[in-house]
Curated annotation (Swiss-Prot):
Binding sites annotated in the UniProt record for 3-methyl-2-oxobutanoate: 49-50, 88, 118
UniProt source species: Parvibaculum lavamentivorans (strain DS-1 / DSM 13023 / NCIMB 13966)
Protein name, UniProt field: 3-methyl-2-oxobutanoate hydroxymethyltransferase
Active site residues according to the UniProt entry: 187
E.C. number(s) listed in UniProt: 2.1.2.11
Length: 274
């Protein structure tokens, strides 16, 4: 009797090995239902703290809690078989000390079943990245426009548009790579700088509003599907589901009011008497 082989999940070493090779494909995911649809087509899924804005209507990601990330991370892991799953560490869960970061990252790994966590920041959190990786927790880094620091940055501003900013951002990239991160997200960054960083470090770069020369790309799923009312410049909508959802809701409302739904085929009949 043949036994169907289980689908093998993408691993951290496989992501690292894609440096300079076939581009790495990624999207965000926040719950099991949509994760099932996109799982076969991506290399990793990011359960991003952007869920605070996308799913909960928050103005920023700062209000997202560790418990929220764990709940959504677990849902995405349950809904996937193939993609490596990375979960964001939310604001306030890792900055205080490497020890606290490790404690919280352990919770994320244990309670979600994900493979890795993502931390925002460069040189300032390199010590924490090193501390986690030495203790068996894979870390994806995130530099450039870091949404958890928008209060300091003064908003969602593209980074590196002036050459005077390049040295600090390049130092961030080198610091996280040397600390042991297996990949780094480059967000909201001038294209020439993102391309330059990609050539400078030996770990994959994942671009979002960065450069086509990055080793991979990521988008927020809802942006890619056309569900965001004001998508950023770097977003390409591969579908227009927002308009389709509105159209479907309008058609449903009309059918209910006209009493054409539910029709006979949508109702249950009595059992025939014996």
């Amino acid at each position: 009797m043949s036994v169907q082989s289980k689908i093998k999940r993408v691993t951290v070493p496989e992501i690292r090995a894609r440096k300079g090779a076939e581009p790495i494909v990624s999207l965000t995911a926040y719950h099991a239902h949509t994760a099932r649809y996109i799982d076969p087509y991506v290399d990793f899924l990011l359960v991003g703290d952007s869920l605070g804005m996308v799913m909960y209507g928050m103005e920023t990601t700062l209000g997202v809690t560790l418990d929220m990330m764990i709940a959504h991370g677990a849902a995405v892991v349950r809904g996937t078989e193939r993609a490596l799953v990375v979960v964001d560490m939310p604001f306030g869960s890792y900055e205080e000390s490497p020890e606290i970061a490790f404690r919280n990252a352990c919770r994320v790994i244990k309670e979600t079943g994900c493979t890795a966590v993502k931390l925002e920041g460069g040189t300032r959190i390199a010590e924490t990245i090193r501390y986690l990786t030495l203790r068996g927790i894979p870390v994806m880094a995130h530099i450039g426009l870091t949404p958890q620091n928008i209060q300091v940055m003064g908003g969602f501003k593209t980074q590196g548009r002036e050459e005077g900013e390049w040295a600090a951002i390049e130092a961030d990239a080198k610091a996280v790579a040397e600390a042991g991160a297996f990949a780094v997200v480059l967000e909201g960054m001038a294209e020439p700088l993102a391309a330059r960083i990609t050539g400078q470090i030996d770990i994959p770069t994942i671009g979002i509003g960065a450069s086509p020369n990055c080793d991979g790309q990521i988008l927020v799923l809802e942006d890619m599907l056309g569900l965001s009312p004001r998508p950023a410049k770097f977003v390409r909508e591969f579908a227009t589901l927002g308009a389709q959802i509105a159209g479907a809701a309008e058609a449903y409302a009309r059918a209910v009011r006209e009493r054409s739904f539910p029709a006979a085929e949508h109702t249950y009949s009595m059992k025939k008497a014996k």
